[in-house]
Amino acid sequence: MNETSNRDHQVTSKEILDVAFEKSKSKFTTPRQTIQDTEELQSYQQTKRKEFEQHINKNRLNLGQWTRYAKWEIENNHDFPRARSILERALDVNIQHVPFWIQYIQLELSHKNINHARNLMERAINTLPRVNKLWFLYVQTEEMLKNYPMVRAVFERWLDWHPDTSAWDAYINFEARYEEKENVRTIFKKYVHEFPNAGTWYKWIKYEMENNRDDVNTVRAVFESAVDTLLSNKSEENDDDEEFATIISSWTSWEVSCGEASRANEIFKLLLDNKTNKLEISDQTKSSIYTAFVEFEKNFGNKDSIEQSVLIKRRIKYEQEIQNDPYDYDSWWKYMTLLQNSSNKSDLENAFKKVTGNVVHDKHKSIKWRRYIMFWIWYAFWEEMTNNNPVSAREIWNNCLKVIPHKSFTFAKVWIGYSEFELRNSEDGLAKARKILGRAIGQTSINKPKIKIFKYYIDLEKKLGDWNRVRLLFQKWLEVSLLTTSSSELVIEKYVEFESSIEEYDRCDSILSSARQLSENPEYSSSFNLQRLLEITVEFYKEEMQYDKIREIYRALLDKDPNAHNWISFALFESSIPSAEQLEEYLQGDNEEFEATVDESQIESTRNIFEEAMTYFKDKDDKESRLVIIEAWRDFEEVNGSDESLSKVTKRLPVIVRKRRTVGSIEEEYIDYIFPDDESKKLPGKMSKFLANAKKWAQQN
């Protein structure tokens, strides 16, 4: 009886999990090990050492393990000899590992083993003399111990290895901290010999000026030595050294502060005198020195000498740059600004003729062309505004248009500038401006419409209130876009905005209908982005609250192009418009502003569209599109649906499986999607077939 009951009782998975959970609640604590006598201590030490040795043998290059081993010996056993032995063994493995050297040294220092640490630092710098970090650690340690003679000795040994400037700077800072001025000067003498550049000399000068400014002879001697050395050792690598100009500026400023303005003036003249060929100073350095000289003249020169020297110097500089490169428009601009400010009319006019006479040869609309055209525009405005010569200005505008290769590219700012010029300076300026803008459209619409010109012309006619001309311009813009297969959505959008602004809603409807018809014409379809055109159309009809019209457009679109994106757009549209109740409430209310909220009726409409899309792609056996639809539906439910509706949609997501098929004579792997909707319909057939086979088997037996 008991056997029968045991056989009938089956252990469930829940019971197994309950037992496992109860067992997991049991608390297991590691037994605490206590050491009672010396033998147990030795046994424990032997065990730990064996563990460390095993870890080290596994990876001898892991120097961190060696360090942990040594620290354990010190912290737990106070066995420094054994710890040092371990660290020495680690050095045998990799003696060039700088962080390990530092850890070894700091370990000794932390336990106040100064002599051991000093011996280690000696070994370290002898082993790795090119590593600055070890030298820095050595000198910092000795300075901390106030062993200053030893610090100097270490620095001197370090300098024998010809280190970089950081070592020299550290040595100088050390001596400067303890105000050992003579020692600092001695080091600087070696420093400038080792690094004979302007930066090194400037450090010395800066030190003397900060600490010994009243010692005039010494400071001047350093300045003179610096300049003499740098000029005599001029080479390509320091030829344009900006620090040299800084030294000169500092020298002259210091001389002035000492009441030696005449000496400072002589220094500038000596360096800037072009007749003197003894000093080879680069143009860049000389320019920097000249800038300092100008500042000097402002403070100590007379007005005439200052202005004359500045203008002449800058003019010569710009003329040389222009002569070297006639297309250096930056120099041209500075040069002509200088001439304009100096009221030199004839020279400025000649400069305008020269710069506009050098036509750019680039075949594309390059930055050179853009800068070149700006000089033409400046030239025309200068003649009109400054010289009051509209005849000459008109000729300049025409000549500018002649040099532009309009078949390749053009400049809207020139056409617009010319038309505005005629508006300002002619009795029949409006007619001339329209003629210029019409000519611009004709000459610049060979490859594609020049949008800036169309926009400017349309805005002009809007200001004049000539709606018929505005419509003609929009139609011309659209015509050019279609003939040149350019994007036409912008002109449609702007055209609709214009008609809507003057409340011509029937015209807007006609424009959008015509645009849709043109987009369906194979001859013009390449000029339209259907998605953007749809957005413009939907946006307009939404503003007009013609939601049924939008639905008709979507249905027509789905008949022609029933892709997943269009279905999703249609579905989401239903949730972006107000419900009938919300619309009725708005129409009966007094509020001018209206904000639609998503309620259940809108959500249900969106779901119906998604369901319709799923059915459509299921009938077409387009599983990829079904996947896109169901994922979009899921995203929609996450935002607007309930947990129940989201769960229903989530359960309809397909299972991704990998299958193989033979294409031709080649077997390939592909991804298939198994939808639960499809499997649920197949299940009854499989079950009936299984039952039929079972019945047949039973009859045979």
From Swiss-Prot:
Main location group: nucleus
Subcellular compartments: Nucleus
One Pfam assignment: HAT_Syf1_CNRKL1_C
Entries under InterPro entries matching the protein: HAT, HAT_Syf1-like_N, HAT_Syf1_CNRKL1_C, Syf1-like, TPR-like_helical_dom_sf
Keyword Nucleus attributed: yes
GO annotations of cellular component type: chromatin; post-mRNA release spliceosomal complex; Prp19 complex; U2-type catalytic step 1 spliceosome; U2-type catalytic step 2 spliceosome; U2-type post-mRNA release spliceosomal complex; U2-type prespliceosome
Keyword list, A-Z: mRNA processing, mRNA splicing, Nucleus, Repeat, Spliceosome
GO molecular function: chromatin binding; DNA replication origin binding
GO biological process, one term: cis assembly of pre-catalytic spliceosome
SUPFAM superfamilies reported for this sequence: TPR-like
Organism superkingdom: Eukaryota
HAT repeat start-end pairs: 43-75, 78-110, 112-144, 146-177, 179-210, 214-253, 266-299, 309-341, 343-378, 388-424, 545-576, 601-642
Function: Involved in pre-mRNA splicing and cell cycle progression. Required for the spliceosome assembly and initiation of the DNA replication.
Family: Belongs to the crooked-neck family.
Binding partners and assembly: Associated with the spliceosome.
The protein's name: Pre-mRNA-splicing factor CLF1
Species name: Candida albicans (strain SC5314 / ATCC MYA-2876)
